[in-house]
């Protein structure tokens, strides 16, 4: 892990009046960049030439850093270009996937918003389970391997893969059949199979809950809630049951979009309690904790119990559903507030208070 002192040494050489907020052109970059501009920051996007159109058309980026391929963002010349523009990187799922988690931890020497040490805790299922379970949150039962399957389960794989390759099954035979099909299609590798995470299939309504922990205020804020459009499952459920049986199609769970929702108000105490518990446990296990945005992906069962099946330890894709604010985020200020602008507000306040060390790593 890059020492915090080294990152702070880099930041001390910056022109503090000309800080640029930078992210990779993908995932949640539109509201990250727009939010930064609304708070008066210069912005830059890292992109390839065939993917720069949204950032030009929407006018969210002041500067463009072009790479031949997104994995080039870890190259030293790109890092130096970022340092020269006094950059603070805002990481999201695509940034981590393209840069590589090992590079983020050990070689990417550019100041980054949030706690870069916690990113591995969302990527590795055992660490994620340790954090979620240690927080006292209700999580699905975990199975040690396919031979332990004794009922409906969901099979997942590590990393930010947008649900690609996930599948449900009920028997060990079905597990290996589907593994074989996905390997044949090139969706899964043998290494993926070795890291398969098998958990209880929880029946319930899906809620992805987006929080922001402010280290400057020591407070967890509820920013918004969304649900996902997943292919092919959301298309299959529109097919009559008798026709589904004739089609014999195994559903997939690839995230293709998101839509905003509100949760019944009587569940909000449970929602806040979950966020508070996770933030508290994160301070203990991965100091300095869960800085900035995080997400708990949950299912609400018929007993109105929220079961957390996954977390994001950085800005989650579902925050795109409230680029102009959510029914919850607007309650804090009375004005529209995206997650991107909330991040920029925290950076701006940290600079004003000379407490930037509290929000970057």
Curated annotation (Swiss-Prot):
Positions with a binding annotation for 5-amino-1-(5-phospho-beta-D-ribosyl)imidazole-4-carboxamide: 27, 94, 258
Stretches that traverse the bilayer: none
Pathway annotation: Purine metabolism; IMP biosynthesis via de novo pathway; 5-formamido-1-(5-phospho-D-ribosyl)imidazole-4-carboxamide from 5-amino-1-(5-phospho-D-ribosyl)imidazole-4-carboxamide (formate route): step 1/1
Entry coiled-coil feature ranges: none
Residues annotated for ATP binding in this entry: 146-208, 230
One GO term (biological process): 'de novo' IMP biosynthetic process
Domain ATP-grasp, chain residue ranges per copy: 116-348
Keyword annotations of the record: ATP-binding, Ligase, Magnesium, Manganese, Metal-binding, Nucleotide-binding, Purine biosynthesis
InterPro entries: ATP_grasp_subdomain_1, IMP_biosynth_PurP, IMP_biosynth_PurP_C, IMP_biosynth_PurP_N, PreATP-grasp_dom_sf
Family per similarity comment: Belongs to the phosphohexose mutase family.
Database matches in HAMAP family: IMP_biosynth_PurP (MF_01163)
Free-text function comment from the UniProt entry: Catalyzes the ATP- and formate-dependent formylation of 5-aminoimidazole-4-carboxamide-1-beta-d-ribofuranosyl 5'-monophosphate (AICAR) to 5-formaminoimidazole-4-carboxamide-1-beta-d-ribofuranosyl 5'-monophosphate (FAICAR) in the absence of folates.
NCBIfam families: PRK13278.1-5
Protein name, as recorded: 5-formaminoimidazole-4-carboxamide-1-(beta)-D-ribofuranosyl 5'-monophosphate synthetase
Lineage of the organism: Archaea, Methanobacteriati, Methanobacteriota, Methanomada group, Methanococci
């Amino acid at each position: 892990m890059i020492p915090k002192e080294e990152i702070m040494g880099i930041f001390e050489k910056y022109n503090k009046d000309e800080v640029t907020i930078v992210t990779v052109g993908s995932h949640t970059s539109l509201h990250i960049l727009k939010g930064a501009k609304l708070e008066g920051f210069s912005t830059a996007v890292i992109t390839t030439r065939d993917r720069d159109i949204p950032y030009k058309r929407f006018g969210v980026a002041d500067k463009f850093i072009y790479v031949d391929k997104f994995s080039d963002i870890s190259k030293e010349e790109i890092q130096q270009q970022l340092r020269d523009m006094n950059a603070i990187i805002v990481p999201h799922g695509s940034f981590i996937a393209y840069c590589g988690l090992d590079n983020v931890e050990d070689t990417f020497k550019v100041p980054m918003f949030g706690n870069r040490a916690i990113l591995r805790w969302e990527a590795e299922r055992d660490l994620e389970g340790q954090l979620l379970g240690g927080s006292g949150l209700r999580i699905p039962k975990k199975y040690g391997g396919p031979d332990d399957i004794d009922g409906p389960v969901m099979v997942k794989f590590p990393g930010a893969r947008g649900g690609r390759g996930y599948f449900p099954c009920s028997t060990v035979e079905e597990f290996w059949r589907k593994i074989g099909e996905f390997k044949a299609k090139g969706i899964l590798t043998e290494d993926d199979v070795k890291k398969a995470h098998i958990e209880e299939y929880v029946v319930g309504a899906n809620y992805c809950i987006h929080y922001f922990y402010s280290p400057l205020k020591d407070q967890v804020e509820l920013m918004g809630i969304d649900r996902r459009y997943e292919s092919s499952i959301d298309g299959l459920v529109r097919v009559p049951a008798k026709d589904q049986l004739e089609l014999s199609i195994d559903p997939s769970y690839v995230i293709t979009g998101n839509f905003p929702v509100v949760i019944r108000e009587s569940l909000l105490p449970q929602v806040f309690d979950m966020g508070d518990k996770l933030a508290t446990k994160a301070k203990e296990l991965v100091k300095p904790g869960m800085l900035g945005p995080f997400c708990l992906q949950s299912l609400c069962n018929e007993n109105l119990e929220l079961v957390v099946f996954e977390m994001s330890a950085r800005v989650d894709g579902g925050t795109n559903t409230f680029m102009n604010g959510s029914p919850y985020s607007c309650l804090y200020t009375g004005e529209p507030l995206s997650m991107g602008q909330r991040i920029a507000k925290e950076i701006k306040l940290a600079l004003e208070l000379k407490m930037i060390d509290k929000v970057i790593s």
